[in-house]
Amino acid sequence: MAAPTLTDPALARRLLVHEARGQLSLGRELRDLGDGWLLYDPADSEPFWNRLVAPRWPAAPEPFDRRLDEVITLFSTLDRVAHIRPLPLGNEPVNMVDRLLAAGFDRIGADRRMVLVDPAPCREVVAAWNARTAGRLAFERHQDGIAEVGPGWATDAATVLAAAFAVDPLRRVALETDVLACTARRGCSILMLRDDGDAVAVARRATISDGTYLSSIGTRPDRRGRGLGSLVTALAVADALDAGSAFVHLAVELDNEPARLFYEGLGFGVVGGIVPDLLLR
């Protein structure tokens, strides 16, 4: 049975904007447009890094269309494809998604937003692991440009993520660069589990202001079913809470029902409906 869905529009907006803040890096900007937030990367045209988040526009047709034209023009001046990510609930206007689809946008993906509502399951997982006096599992935390082990750790983390998410091997170097970029940013850390020295599970934690966004949570396919994903997630949550985070959140792809159930089991709840990624065709 699915856990109750949270229906707080202010929380939904807070999470989407916080996610964008957690994805800032050197040169990447988050602009407050007054009626939405624009994430813009001058060096990378990938739509994921160039998107308008949580827009709030007039409901009347003419002002809505005028604002949409302005936003499309803004993306064009930045030499980017218009990419809009509405809220999972509380959109203004309420039929924002339908209007954008009618205006020529395509849904290229969708996910659900989840926020920690009960820390007890994660605390219990961590406590059970801490109670072990010996074992092959080791936990590493890489943050603030400081690695707890040798320089090869980033390669190991990228290899785990590439396997976990079936990423093209040619992109492994890009993954490694992204991993290193995370640890160079204040508040961003990579958590990794090793089993007898082999990297087996990874999670990324971005703690910004009073919240934490978790992402890139993955386990090597040949090591799944052993509780490693639960453990690395629980350790990331524990770190976030210890850092004083008032909220901890993550995103799950819409068609990944097992992942939703997995995170619900760790104390997370779904916020609103789906969050579509809309790209102008």
Q: Which sequence ranges carry the predicted segments?
A:
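Conserved GNAT acetyl-CoA-binding A-motif
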Residues: 78-88, 240-251
